[in-house]
Amino acid sequence: MVESDKSSVEELKKRVRKRSRGKKNEQQKAEEKTHTVEENADETQKKSEKKVKKVRGKIEEEEEKVEAMEDGEDEKNIVIVGKGIMTNVTFDSLDLSEQTSIAIKEMGFQYMTQIQAGSIQPLLEGKDVLGAARTGSGKTLAFLIPAVELLFKERFSPRNGTGVIVICPTRELAIQTKNVAEELLKHHSQTVSMVIGGNNRRSEAQRIASGSNLVIATPGRLLDHLQNTKAFIYKHLKCLVIDEADRILEENFEEDMNKILKILPKTRQTALFSATQTSKVKDLARVSLTSPVHVDVDDGRRKVTNEGLEQGYCVVPSKQRLILLISFLKKNLNKKIMVFFSTCKSVQFHTEIMKISDVDVSDIHGGMDQNRRTKTFFDFMKAKKGILLCTDVAARGLDIPSVDWIIQYDPPDKPTEYIHRVGRTARGEGAKGKALLVLIPEELQFIRYLKAAKVPVKELEFNEKRLSNVQSALEKCVAKDYNLNKLAKDAYRAYLSAYNSHSLKDIFNVHRLDLLAVAESFCFSSPPKVNLNIESGAGKVRKARKQQGRNGFSPYSPYGKSTPTKEA
């Protein structure tokens, strides 16, 4: 009985040991399984961490690219920030030919301006460039130096035809650009010629046929030669430069430019320079440039006008405008002055009136013979003192040295035109100049537009007692002289017509003008009978006056009831 019990116990112990071994095996297997799962989890985690690192790396790379673009470090976007227009980068640092280097030194240049430092190297490398810089920043050398170097390296000769074309908005700017090009080409064998409206077309065609490697042109005349001068060899064109693109488009050359771009070879380098980046300029850049390097100059100036420029305006009744101008010019005969008018007829009339008033002046306007216009321009450029009466043909791009005063006798069409007009003075580092805008009381709200455009102007008062007492004498001269009387009528009509076409009609409304006072400013005792072809706007004026009344606006309260916007 006991033995059987013992055997039962032993058998029971064996079963227990068996079960425990089974449990241990199960536990061991479970542990191994758990360990395997953990290992797999670790591997998965490591893989995901690697992916995260890769993604983070890509994000960081993108952020670095964005930062580089914002900082102007990206190759396609060069933003130059600094004080003034000059840099400490020398022309010697460029890899230029000996001939060009000698010419630059002979011209008296050692250091580059900001637009030159940003544009010349990319252009030398054959890249397209879209340059944005204000007037007087040195854009001409920025594109002419690479143009001359390109012609030299490609070994262009007259038989190769034209390798570079430069398009300018005005004849005067084209003339000035050609002069600079001639100085740069002084020690080179390459040739330069100019094709502009007003010149003898046949002579231009002969020069082109003989082989002009560098052609400076205005849009209309260039298109004429491209379409009609069979001997014009432009199939080897390497580079097209569009200077003052915004002004070209403002002068309604958009259609001509599109035709020119269609005719010229597509495989070329293109450089486009513009003081302002309007929507039309961007459209032109889009169709003419390929992956351009953007060069944007920020010279650290808060003002949009030149640094050394003092700007003011005076409010004068219409009938006293002419007397004020004569008095001012007589007191400043030893200065170099440019006076801007809205029309050619007005320039012609005031030139005659100044002669009668013993004020020696010269004049430039679009209706002049080109030879006389060119001579007048260069005479005024070289003069240390003198008075030039002009239209806006002289408002852009021209580098006229040492201009003391810019007088805007007729107000500009918009703030940008004001900026370009006053840009003829205080040009270059450390230069000084003054500008005066003449307004009648009805035009005073124009100051709001200028201040919104960050143009700092202050009101200047004039002493009526010091004005020349010549009004009645001038009226008698105009009444007696048939030719002068006709010229005065034409100028009066042209002034009103230009006024009526003004873009800022909320300010420059011809129906608000006191025609008797306007007539007096053209030396008439009463308004002359002229056909103006101006639609009546009396109803609109009455409505506008009511609206102005609600807001407190008037010619004598240009800011209305609300506080005027502070100048930035």
From Swiss-Prot:
It comes from Arabidopsis thaliana (Mouse-ear cress). The keyword Metal-binding does not apply. A motif (Q motif) lies at residues 89-117. The Q motif is unique to and characteristic of the DEAD box family of RNA helicases and controls ATP binding and hydrolysis. It holds the Pfam family CTE_SPB4. Residues 1-13, 23-47 have a biased composition (Basic and acidic residues). The gene is RH51. Residues 321-468 form the Helicase C-terminal domain. Belongs to the DEAD box helicase family. DDX18/HAS1 subfamily. GO terms for molecular function: ATP binding; ATP hydrolysis activity; RNA binding; RNA helicase activity. Disulfide bonds: none annotated. A motif (DEAD box) lies at residues 243-246. Transmembrane segments: none annotated. This is DEAD-box ATP-dependent RNA helicase 51. SUPFAM superfamilies: P-loop containing nucleoside triphosphate hydrolases (SSF52540). Residues 13-78 form a coiled coil. Residues 60-70 have a biased composition (Acidic residues). PROSITE patterns: DEAD_ATP_HELICASE (PS00039), HELICASE_ATP_BIND_1 (PS51192), HELICASE_CTER (PS51194), Q_MOTIF (PS51195).
